[in-house]
Regions:
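Iron-sulfur cluster-binding electron-transfer modules in prokaryotic oxidoreductases
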Residues: 1-137
Length: 137
């Protein structure tokens, strides 16, 4: 079984909790053992986007402490994954957290990226009858 750490962003936690539960179901169906740290909160993107970089950095430091480099970190949010992969460069480059940040950045995946490119899964027996939207972050 493939162990993964699950990051549920603050907006999903508060507004779309079913998405969190469905993410767990999907990862388990793909053969993952899901680890969920109940102390996690946010990636810091709302503060970062609003220009409050000191606050975003504090939240980001908590994020770096809440997750490990031992297992892939999987999130159902492309924008939060993008924040960690790209935005954290603005917050942590040339700091004492720089190396740890780089390790986390290499280890975080949006769920579809993880399933297709890491787990090599492309079919789950489901079919969508309707429209879908793709958000490239």
């Amino acid at each position: 079984m493939h162990k993964v750490e699950l990051f549920i962003p603050c907006f999903i936690d508060q507004l779309y909790p079913e998405t969190a539960f469905n993410t767990i179901k999907l990862l388990e169906k793909a053969g993952c053992d899901v680890i969920y740290n109940t102390e996690q909160t946010c990636c810091g993107q709302p503060a970062y986007n609003a220009g409050f970089w000191d606050d975003a950095k504090s939240i980001g430091q908590k994020f770096l402490n809440d997750f490990t480099e031992e297992h892939p970190i999987v999130s159902p949010s492309a924008s939060c994954t993008g924040m960690v992969r790209e935005g954290y460069d603005d917050l942590f480059t040339n700091t004492t957290d720089h190396n740890r940040c780089r390790g986390i950045q290499r280890n975080i995946f949006e769920i579809s990226d993880f399933l297709v490119n890491v787990m090599k899964k492309e079919y789950f027996g489901a079919e969508l009858v309707g429209r879908a939207v793709y958000h490239d972050s």
